[in-house]
């Protein structure tokens, strides 16, 4: 039976052992151990049995260069495929590879056209325009017949109840909101006219309710007309009596 030392001597030549002993590492860094030195030149051993030796593993270093992350000019990180799958296992290597794919997609998205960047995003200009349109109401354009009907009703009734508003809106072909808005604007003009005509106070309260006796009712208007007619009749009777007395 052959001694193990003799087998080792058969695997490695004597000059290789001398070169290994002659070289001393200056530090214990991995880079110092794994880098090649000019004075350490070992002829590669031959034979199928030598490929599993310690020196063969250290000299070949199949995965040393791949473990260092390299970045090309585009800034895309490239991860090794075979070392991770061999050393880290399937779950961890698949997770890292998926992360690398995400980095590649994210970095390459900078070179995509503008329409691809904006895909799936709302246009802020269109959103702002829609908000302004929602805040503003379109101005209603009334016809002459509608304006005449509203003015006649406003002369008789400055404030409308809900049933009156519904009836007026249906008769004129308008909505209740349109009638209400028109009445509010018309009352504001009416208040200004009253104040400009010499009125000391507005005919309505700050909350919009009319003051007492500021708006005459239909009964009061009829009584005023009756008194005016009576005054006219009395004036006409008095003038006729005076004429008869003058003739006598």
From Swiss-Prot:
Key words, A-Z: DNA-binding, Homeobox, Nucleus, Transcription, Transcription regulation
One Pfam assignment = Homeodomain
Which residue ranges have biased composition labelled Basic and acidic residues?
223-234
Portion annotated as DNA-binding: 135-194
Tell me which SUPFAM superfamilies the record gives.
Answer: Homeodomain-like
List where in the cell it is found.
Nucleus
Task: Output the InterPro entries linked to this UniProt entry.
Answer: HD, HD_metazoa, Homeobox_CS, Homeobox_TF, Homeodomain-like_sf, HTH_motif
Q: Which SMART domains does this UniProt record tie to the protein?
A: HOX (SM00389)
Where does the record place Polar residues bias? 237-248
The record's function comment reads: Transcription factor, is involved in craniofacial development, and in stomach organogenesis.
* PANTHER family to which the protein is assigned, alphabetical: HOMEO BOX HB9 LIKE A-RELATED, HOMEOBOX PROTEIN BARH-LIKE 1B
Protein name per UniProt: Homeobox protein BarH-like 1
Please name the source species: Danio rerio
Q: Which gene encodes it?
A: barx1
């Amino acid at each position: 039976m052959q001694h193990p030392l003799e087998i080792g001597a058969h695997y490695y030549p004597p000059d290789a052992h001398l070169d290994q002993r002659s070289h001393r590492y200056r530090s214990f860094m991995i880079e110092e151990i794994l880098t090649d030195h000019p004075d350490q030149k070992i002829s590669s051993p031959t034979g199928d049995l030598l490929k599993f030796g310690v020196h063969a593993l250290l000299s070949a270093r199949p995965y040393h260069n791949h473990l260092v992350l390299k970045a090309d000019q585009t800034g895309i990180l490239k991860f090794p495929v075979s070392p991770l799958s061999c050393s880290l296992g399937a779950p961890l290597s698949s997770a890292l590879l998926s992360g690398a794919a995400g980095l590649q997609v994210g970095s390459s998205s900078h070179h995509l056209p503008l329409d691809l960047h904006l895909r799936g995003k709302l246009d802020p200009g269109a959103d702002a325009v829609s908000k302004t349109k929602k805040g503003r109401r379109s101005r209603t354009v009334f016809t002459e017949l509608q304006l005449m009907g509203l003015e006649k009703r406003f002369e008789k009734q400055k404030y409308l109840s809900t049933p009156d508003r519904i009836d007026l809106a249906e008769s004129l072909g308008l909505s209740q909101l349109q009638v209400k808005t028109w009445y509010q604007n018309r009352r504001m003009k009416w208040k200004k006219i009253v104040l400009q005509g010499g009125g000391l106070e507005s005919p309505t309260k700050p909350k919009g309710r009319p003051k007492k006796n500021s708006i005459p009712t239909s009964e009061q208007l009829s009584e005023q007309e009756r008194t005016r007619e009576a005054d006219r009749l009395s004036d006409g009777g008095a003038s006729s009596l005076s004429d008869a007395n003058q003739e006598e």
